[in-house]
A protein has these predicted regions:
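Short Gly/aromatic-enriched secondary-structure transition segments
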Residues: 24-29
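Surface-exposed ligand/attachment interfaces on beta-rich extracellular proteins
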Residues: 15-19, 33-64, 77-81, 119-126
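A short linear-motif detector with a strong N-terminal bias
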Residues: 1-6, 49-50, 61-63, 85-86
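A short beta-strand element within beta-rich, extracytoplasmic domains
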Residues: 9-13, 65-74
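Sterically constrained small-residue positions within well-ordered secondary structures
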Residues: 2, 14-16, 61, 74, ...
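Short, surface-exposed beta-strand/strand-loop-strand elements in extracellular ectodomains
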Residues: 75-95
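Intrinsically disordered, low-complexity Pro/Gly/Ser/Thr-rich segments with frequent PxxP/GP/PP motifs
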Residues: 1-9, 89-126
Length: 126
């Protein structure tokens, strides 16, 4: 389970090449002090540079953001991808994988991380 609770808590991907990477993140916000305590959301990010990219922003004040799904698909060629939890001060490395073209790094709540090949078959599990 990945939960963001602080005003600066974000999930970032660090990529080592300019090959295209399509990223989808879905989550649920828990705001117990409101009439609608659970609000789902999603973010889609296209990465096309060797860079550090925030793929999930910090939650609003008094909100816990539970990550449900992360998918990062290497569309344009091989790319080494590092997943980081960043609290505004320190980057905590979660994992690093090298994706071949067409492969997808996937996180699913309660299942953890895996890599899928270009056909969608599970390749590895961390």
């Amino acid at each position: 389970m990945i939960i963001l609770t602080g005003a600066a808590d974000v999930i970032r991907l660090v990529t080592t090449s300019a090959n295209a990477l399509d990223v989808h993140v879905s989550w649920v916000d828990n705001q117990t002090a409101t009439a609608t305590p659970y609000t789902p959301g999603r973010t889609n990010t296209a990465i096309a540079a060797a860079a550090t990219t925030t793929v999930l922003a910090a939650p609003a004040p008094s909100t816990q953001r539970q990550v449900k799904k992360v998918m990062a698909c290497a569309r344009g060629g091989a790319n080494t991808v590092t997943v980081e939890f960043f609290d505004g001060t320190t980057a905590f490395r979660q994992l690093q994988v090298t994706l071949a073209s067409g492969e997808t790094l996937e996180y699913e709540d309660l299942c953890g991380w895996s890599v899928r090949d270009a056909t969608g078959a599970a390749k590895t599990t961390n």
